[in-house]
């Protein structure tokens, strides 16, 4: 189990390689990263026994930016028939697991394998339980089987509390029919990723106040209104009429970069299409000056050196807050609903 498999958005394999290689170097885990363009995954091949396990134990998956999911393990070739027997034999050297996910890569080939995985899961689960390789009442790791085809699978494991919240890191969020744009799912996914579900009722409570910069037509505003948060929607464009009729939205026709609330708010959110450095500076200002307690801001990415640029901007935000003497948690993730962008979350401590 000396290979670390990392899922990602197609086209961002290079960013995953750069990110995991940097962490491995810091942790002194020898190895190398490799990936094929648009394959929706990357691999880190460890040069020493136990390297992949050390990486996963020393890193928090939630702190990684570009990987959607990860697992340590090995590739296994499967026959056309009796795949289960071959899998069971291979798993003899693996720990007993407490959950099972069958995964595919986020490619056209991967999507075509989804039906196979759905049909294969029930008989496989039954066989694993019968063979004592799966104990769903136990405390073992999660068994993650990533199928590249019906004949090739990556047999991996990961701790359930240190890996993706959803299979392949892809959330199953339903688009709310009342929301004025599909961008609404970005903010909902961000909340799932950055805020533990048990804290939603206190950190996203009814009666709180929020500002949505670049709000029109109101996709992100809708998420706050849906939780009965009072919103100042800032945009020169028109807002959705139903949102305005909710009584929870005040529309300010103003520039999102110059707008300031009359008093501090609980939340600031921003999905303005602008140079990432400008959005990062806006984020630092709002948290640094105490204009809000928490913020979610999207940073659009350049065409090249994307990981290096994100890292530079996060360091600039951290340095700026340190100079102000402000303590804050800083999180960053390329969410499933993000495209050429990442989502940053800051919380003033």
From Swiss-Prot:
It is found in: Cytoplasm. It holds the Pfam family RlmM_FDX. S-adenosyl-L-methionine binds at residues 183, 216-219, 235, 255, 271. InterPro entries: RlmM_FDX, RlmM_THUMP-like, RNA_MeTrfase_FtsJ_dom, rRNA_MeTrfase_M, SAM-dependent_MTases_sf. One of its GO terms (biological process) is rRNA processing. The keyword Cytoplasm applies. Its EC number is 2.1.1.186. The active site is at residue 300. Keywords: Cytoplasm, Methyltransferase, rRNA processing, S-adenosyl-L-methionine, Transferase. One of its GO terms (molecular function) is S-adenosylmethionine-dependent methyltransferase activity. GO terms for cellular component: cytoplasm. It catalyses: cytidine(2498) in 23S rRNA + S-adenosyl-L-methionine = 2'-O-methylcytidine(2498) in 23S rRNA + S-adenosyl-L-homocysteine + H(+). It is an enzyme of class 2 (transferase). Its main location: cytoplasm. It comes from the Bacteria. Belongs to the class I-like SAM-binding methyltransferase superfamily. RNA methyltransferase RlmE family. RlmM subfamily. Monomer. Catalyzes the 2'-O-methylation at nucleotide C2498 in 23S rRNA. This is Ribosomal RNA large subunit methyltransferase M.
